[in-house]
Amino acid sequence: MIKQRTIKQSVQETGIGLHKGDKVTMTLRPAPANTGIVFRRVDLEPHADIPARAEAVGDTMLCTCITNADGVSISTVEHLASALAGLGIDNIIVEVDSDELPIMDGSASPFIFLLQSVGIEELNAPKQFIKIKKAIKVKDGDKWAELRPHDGFRVDFRIDFDHPAISQTRQHMVLDFDSSSYVDEVSRARTFGFMKDLEYMNANNLALGGSMANAVALDEYRVLNPEGLRYSDEFLKHKILDAIGDLYLGGHSIIGELVAYKTGHGLNNKLLNALLQNQACWEFVSYDNSEELPIRFASPILAN
């Protein structure tokens, strides 16, 4: 059978929180089968667990924030969730001593590195996938996102930014994860932002940790980062990275196709909730062997 996954051992990293700009220590710990993804606030006494659940997503203005039944929240979870989705990790405890995860370099790549550095372990329990049986779509003005049946996981994604530096890059792509590697194609794409917005947010005590060390910064005309872009279509690929993370807060990899136009955290979550609340549109499936499995994950990796 295709088995659930966790990590082989714990690993710790320190970084800056995007919103407060404070130092955050994060520890990733292995978890037993059927635990799911659980965020643990160790800065609180007693410690507070916040399970990743679609219905737990609250504020999505600048990032994805999830809240438990007691009202305890954790923010900026989408890049780690995206890395976990890309590596097919089902079970993990994420301890943080803050109300937000470290932003790292603004992509999923540092999380991929941490997870791979300790190795991925298979657990003796079947991995369950959410298989799309019937299309479901959500809209917000001219923005929309849809999940459709597909034997695999494919993303058909379009953005539309009227900005000189973005409009000259690719704004539409179809990525099939049967053949495309998440780690190579998507994980290194950084979040991006406009300097005028950052200045406004800083004045309102928001995004205090935001800098060119963890984002692609744009003025009215161009990219300001001296090193330029990591991918020629980094803006588009970061939006795909976000969507993969947002959809993984349902706790399971999706067998289906995401087709989206100008979607963001709020609409991604609206789509996931609409799906999970409409049982006619999906079912849980598991697979006996890798030949049947229509998604390609990295093989379980041994830590050095």
Curated annotation (Swiss-Prot):
Reactions accelerated catalytically: a UDP-3-O-[(3R)-3-hydroxyacyl]-N-acetyl-alpha-D-glucosamine + H2O = a UDP-3-O-[(3R)-3-hydroxyacyl]-alpha-D-glucosamine + acetate
Name of the protein this chain belongs to: UDP-3-O-acyl-N-acetylglucosamine deacetylase
Name of the top EC class for this enzyme: hydrolase
Gene3D superfamilies: lpxc deacetylase, domain 1, lpxc deacetylase, domain 2
UniProt function note: Catalyzes the hydrolysis of UDP-3-O-myristoyl-N-acetylglucosamine to form UDP-3-O-myristoylglucosamine and acetate, the committed step in lipid A biosynthesis.
Recorded family membership: Belongs to the LpxC family.
Amino acids binding Zn(2+): 79, 238, 242
Keywords of this entry: Hydrolase, Lipid A biosynthesis, Lipid biosynthesis, Lipid metabolism, Metal-binding, Zinc
Entry annotation: catalytic residues: 265 (proton donor)
InterPro entries registered for this protein in UniProt: Ribosomal_Su5_D2-typ_SF (IPR020568), UDP-acyl_GlcNac_deAcase (IPR004463), UDP-acyl_GlcNac_deAcase_C (IPR011334), UDP-acyl_N-AcGlcN_deAcase_N (IPR015870)
One GO MF term: UDP-3-O-acyl-N-acetylglucosamine deacetylase activity
Pathway listed: Glycolipid biosynthesis; lipid IV(A) biosynthesis; lipid IV(A) from (3R)-3-hydroxytetradecanoyl-[acyl-carrier-protein] and UDP-N-acetyl-alpha-D-glucosamine: step 2/6
Pfam family, one: LpxC
UniProt keyword Lipid metabolism present: yes
One Gene Ontology cellular component: membrane
Cofactor: Zn(2+)
